[in-house]
C-alpha cells in the first residue's frame, strides 16, 4: 500500500510518497497553499494520488513539546479532514515534533546546502521524515476510513 506523507504549513505542504511495500519514503514536491484564501492545493494532491497510486495519507501533527495540540496541530487535523472528505482515503497522523529541525540539520551537515536552497526543499524532506518515521513504527496505515 503506497502512502502519502504530508507536512502541512500555512504556506506550503511538503509531500512524500512511500514505495509499494511501505518500507521507504521519498520526498516528491512542495505544494504552495494559502490558508487565508482557502487555497489548500487539493487539486495537486489529487494529481499526485493518481500518478503515484496512493491509497492513504499520513499527516504530520506538530504537537507542542508538552504533548498538547496548538493551532498548527489543529490546522493539520482540519487538513486531514479535508483529505478524507475529498478523496475518501484513510488518514492517520504522525507526531512531527522536530522533523523540520532534523531536516534542516541534515541539509546543513550532510548536504552542505545553502540557506536559499534549504528553503526550497526543507518541507519536502520533512514530509519524507514524517512518513519514514510512521513506516518504521507502523509498517502500514493503522487508521482505516
UniProtKB/Swiss-Prot annotation:
SUPFAM superfamilies for this protein: Ribonuclease H-like
Gene Ontology molecular function, alphabetical: nuclease activity
Subcellular location: Cytoplasm
GO cellular component, one term: cytosol
Superkingdom of the organism of origin: Bacteria
UniProt KW Hydrolase keyword: yes
The EC number(s) this enzyme carries: 3.1.-.-
GO biological process: rRNA 5'-end processing
Entry keyword set: Cytoplasm, Hydrolase, Nuclease, Ribosome biogenesis
Short name of any one Pfam family annotated for the protein: RuvX
Entries under PANTHER family matching the protein: POLYNUCLEOTIDYL TRANSFERASE, RIBONUCLEASE H-LIKE SUPERFAMILY PROTEIN (PTHR33317:SF4)
Record function comment: Could be a nuclease involved in processing of the 5'-end of pre-16S rRNA.
Family: Belongs to the YqgF nuclease family.
Name under which the protein is recorded: Putative pre-16S rRNA nuclease
Annotated organism of origin: Levilactobacillus brevis (strain ATCC 367 / BCRC 12310 / CIP 105137 / JCM 1170 / LMG 11437 / NCIMB 947 / NCTC 947) (Lactobacillus brevis)
Amino acid at each position: 500500500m503506497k502512502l502519502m506523507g504530508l507536512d502541512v504549513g500555512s504556506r506550503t505542504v511538503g509531500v512524500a510518497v512511500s514505495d509499494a511495500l511501505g518500507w521507504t519514503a521519498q520526498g516528491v514536491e512542495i505544494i504552495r497553499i494559502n490558508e487565508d484564501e482557502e487555497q489548500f492545493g487539493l487539486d495537486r494532491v489529487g494529481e499526485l494520488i493518481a500518478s503515484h497510486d496512493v491509497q492513504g495519507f499520513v499527516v504530520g501533527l506538530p504537537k507542542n513539546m508538552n504533548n498538547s495540540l496548538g493551532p498548527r496541530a489543529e490546522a493539520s487535523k482540519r487538513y486531514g479532514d479535508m483529505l478524507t472528505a475529498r478523496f475518501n482515503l484513510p488518514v492517520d497522523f504522525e507526531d512531527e515534533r522536530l522533523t523540520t529541525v532534523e531536516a534542516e540539520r541534515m541539509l546543513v551537515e550532510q548536504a552542505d546546502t545553502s540557506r536559499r536552497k534549504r528553503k526550497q526543499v526543507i518541507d519536502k524532506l520533512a514530509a519524507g521524515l514524517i512518513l519514514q518515521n510512521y513506516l518504521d513504527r507502523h509498517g502500514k496505515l493503522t487508521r482505516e476510513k
